[in-house]
């Protein structure tokens, strides 16, 4: 029997607040470069190098779709393989969508699915790949494999898996029947778990056949499967995205894969993984897994420390200096600064809740915002004016649009701009400018080979992004 195809499924939903101000609702941590030059999503995908598998399937929120597409494109992994969730419904429905898509792509057999989170750090990638290979025979045989992280300390922030009897498998493979899933314990209980040697951290990574998962979901949560089947029956292909039926998916109950299937099935096994795993759940955990200076500091960007110890200092856009401090987290972005005791960073989410309650925007969006055509940076704003730096990628362009409440001035800084205003087309080079009157139908394109940079000055009574009427758009946003 030929080996089943293996589809990596990367869960890239979620918009956590624990790494604010870097992580925002519209740009959460899985899309950030926290270690090295690749984002967490890209690192997750590159970790599969050396594992024989198909192109990854990525599941994400619709509002993150262009970020995911661009990051996959940079890896040459963009192959109409992004499933869009109209709204988050937790992991059981998301995995069901991926399983139905995998079965549709490989109807000749029951493909394997390697379910991964986009925002985990794994230091020993060889150990990760070895654990995946170890788990393959069990998944091929119909088991539902969960990967248990060998704990190195009594962590109270993770759930645990208690192993049972050894599960019969091929020579040189090791797996155990799952005896119990347990919630996050207190410290005393966690210490007992680690001392026993019978418990693993629950990693949230899985390997099983798509059909076997759907069978178990039908057995234990047929309502979830029914909603997901209806959502996938009316798929709308859109560029590199798979859009499911919104109404059908919104009717789907929310449930985690652990509660829906893994805690109920009789075929769950746990494969140990000792690979330097972390879910990077806080600034303190990021400090722990990063390279330190002799003083115990972790620095990113333009940083000068003096008599500073055991601190995490991140400078995004300017010089950050520290003097005579220790055990701090200092994070500077273009529009917000966090200063926290490293042992109290679990309360960062409370600050984010306050920002949201105050009606501010810093919890939701960065000053620099990415779009399918490029990005813009909100440089300055005041009464009836706003200044942005706009970058348009070669060959890309903004929608044909108009605004009810603002006029715009554009000044080209670098590259070439093709500007259409009420049907009149003009080409602008460096240091040339143009005025777009209020109510004019207009479009901006980059016909050149290098990025187009321009300064936009908006003026008017209302300057927010929702003052736009789109008439045509190459990215399907009309």
Swiss-Prot record:
Record-linked Gene3D superfamilies: Jelly Rolls (2.60.120.10), Spore Coat Polysaccharide Biosynthesis Protein SpsA, Chain A (3.90.550.10)
Identification of the protein by name: Mannose-1-phosphate guanylyltransferase 1
EC number assigned by the record: 2.7.7.13
Catalytic activity: alpha-D-mannose 1-phosphate + GTP + H(+) = GDP-alpha-D-mannose + diphosphate
Pfam families: ManC_GMP_beta-helix (PF22640), MannoseP_isomer (PF01050), NTP_transferase (PF00483)
Job description of the protein: Involved in GDP-mannose biosynthesis which serves as the activated sugar nucleotide precursor for mannose residues in cell surface polysaccharides. In vitro, shows very broad substrate specificities for four nucleotides and various hexose-1-phosphates, yielding ADP-mannose, CDP-mannose, UDP-mannose, GDP-mannose, GDP-glucose and GDP-2-deoxy-glucose.
UniProt keywords, alphabetically: GTP-binding, Nucleotide-binding, Nucleotidyltransferase, Transferase
Keyword match GTP-binding: yes
Any one GO MF annotation of this record: GTP binding
GO biological process, one term: GDP-mannose biosynthetic process
pH dependence: Optimum pH is 8.5.
Organism: Escherichia coli O157:H7
Family under the similarity heading: Belongs to the mannose-6-phosphate isomerase type 2 family.
Pathway where it operates: Nucleotide-sugar biosynthesis; GDP-alpha-D-mannose biosynthesis; GDP-alpha-D-mannose from alpha-D-mannose 1-phosphate (GTP route): step 1/1
SUPFAM superfamilies per the UniProt record, alphabetical: Nucleotide-diphospho-sugar transferases, RmlC-like cupins
Broad class of enzyme this protein falls into: transferase
């Amino acid at each position: 029997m030929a080996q089943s195809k293996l589809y990596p499924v990367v869960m890239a939903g979620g918009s956590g607040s624990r790494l604010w101000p870097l992580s925002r609702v519209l740009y959460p941590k899985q899309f950030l470069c926290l270690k090295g030059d690749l984002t967490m999503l890209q690192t997750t995908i590159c970790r599969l190098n050396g594992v024989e598998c198909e192109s990854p399937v990525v599941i994400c929120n619709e509002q993150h779709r262009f970020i995911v597409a661009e990051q996959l494109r940079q890896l040459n992994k963009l192959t109409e393989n992004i499933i869009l969730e109209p709204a988050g419904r937790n992991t059981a429905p998301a995995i069901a969508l991926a399983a139905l898509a995998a079965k549709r792509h490989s109807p000749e057999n029951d493909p394997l699915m390697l379910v991964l989170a986009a925002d985990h750090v794994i230091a020993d990638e060889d150990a990760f790949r070895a654990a995946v290979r170890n788990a393959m025979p069990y998944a091929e045989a119909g088991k539902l494999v969960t990967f248990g992280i060998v704990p190195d300390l009594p962590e109270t922030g993770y759930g645990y898996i208690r192993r049972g009897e050894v599960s019969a498998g091929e020579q040189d493979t090791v797996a155990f029947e799952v005896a119990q899933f347990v919630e996050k314990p207190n410290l005393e209980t966690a210490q007992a778990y680690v001392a026993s040697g019978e418990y693993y951290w629950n990693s949230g990574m899985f390997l099983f056949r798509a059909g076997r998962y759907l069978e178990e979901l039908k057995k234990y949560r047929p309502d979830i499967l029914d909603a997901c089947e209806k959502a996938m029956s009316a798929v709308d292909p859109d560029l590199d995205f798979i859009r499911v039926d919104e109404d059908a998916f919104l009717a789907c109950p929310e449930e985690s894969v652990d509660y829906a299937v893994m805690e109920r099935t009789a075929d769950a096994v746990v494969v140990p993984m000792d690979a330097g795993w972390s879910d990077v759940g806080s600034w303190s955990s990021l400090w722990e897994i990063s390279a330190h200076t002799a003083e115990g500091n972790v620095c990113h960007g333009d940083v000068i420390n003096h008599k500073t110890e055991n601190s995490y200092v991140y400078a995004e856009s300017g010089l950050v200096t520290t003097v005579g401090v220790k055990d701090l987290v200092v994070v500077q972005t273009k529009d917000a600064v966090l200063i926290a005791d490293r042992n109290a960073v679990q309360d960062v989410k409370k600050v984010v809740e306050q920002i949201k309650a105050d009606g501010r925007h810093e919890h939701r969006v960065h000053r620099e915002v990415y779009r399918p055509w490029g990005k813009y940076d909100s440089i300055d704003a005041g009464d009836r004016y706003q200044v942005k730096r706009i970058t348009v990628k070669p060959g890309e362009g903004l929608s044909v649009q108009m605004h009810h409440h603002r006029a715009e001035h554009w000044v080209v800084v670098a590259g070439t701009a093709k500007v259409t205003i009420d049907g009149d087309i003009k080409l602008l080079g460096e240091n040339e400018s143009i005025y777009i009157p209020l109510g004019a139908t207009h479009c901006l394109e980059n016909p050149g080979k290098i990025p187009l940079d321009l300064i936009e000055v908006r003026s008017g009574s209302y300057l927010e992004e929702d003052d736009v009427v789109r008439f045509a758009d190459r990215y399907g946003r009309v």
